[in-house]
Amino acid sequence: MTSDPLTGTPAATPASPAPLPSLRLVDVACRRGDRILFSGLNETLERGQLLWLRGGNGRGKTSLLRLVAGLAAPERGQILWDGVPTRGNEHFDRALVYIAHANALKDDLTATESLAFLARVHGRDAGAPALRAALARLGLAGRERTPVRSLSQGLRRRVALARLALETGPSLGVLDEPFDALDVAGTATLHALLAAHRARGGSVLLTSHHLHLDGAAAGAGFRVLDLDLLPRDGGTAP
């Protein structure tokens, strides 16, 4: 133990930083209608990691994202954030950034107004400077006042993805097909955004049918979860 050089009293030991919370899925099963899409899912997503969900059509990729986002409940199992169930968990709600496959933009609003609306709906109150900066990071500088109806599908996707650029802390990005409709430049921009998000301790759970993701592009902490390898009904995988 060290001591204060002036008083000779023992110096306080610096407290270790609290570990950043992680997402845990414990024996999760997902039902849609009368079918079990998958069961027996046990997975942990640590801060700074990116987990890419893969699987054939109808295997439950989007359904799993909806379970994590709290839009549906698992048939069995638990979804935990820092060891606490995510349902009704205010800490998790504040950390979650869910961007669905549909952009959920209103044609009559401008890009800035749309981003502000999306932020408010999800509990974020972003000021004008933050909105401008987020849109600029997605390559939308100069289009802030452009009505959504005048934007291409790729640019609309960038507006929706700018929600992640508003984040300043280690949040959880849950993204359904984020690369859809993006051109080469937009794809590179999204890769940079994901890297910056993870560098500050954020984590990412996403689906993508596009071959834009690999270990080299995503860097350390990149993992793949193949839902095709999970059993549908608690038995063996197909």
Predicted regions and their residues:
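Conserved structural motif at the start of ABC-family nucleotide-binding domains
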Residues: 23, 37-40
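Q-loop/switch helix immediately C-terminal to the Walker
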Residues: 102, 107-123, 130
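Conserved ABC ATPase "signature" region
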Residues: 116, 128-143, 162
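Catalytic Walker B motif of ABC-type/P-loop ATPase nucleotide-binding domains
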Residues: 173-177
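The feature captures the beta-strand-to-loop junction immediately N-terminal to the Walker
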Residues: 54-56
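Conserved ABC transporter NBD signature motif
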Residues: 74-92
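ABC ATPase nucleotide-binding domain "signature" region
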Residues: 52, 156-165
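Helix-to-loop junction immediately C-terminal to a conserved catalytic motif
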Residues: 69
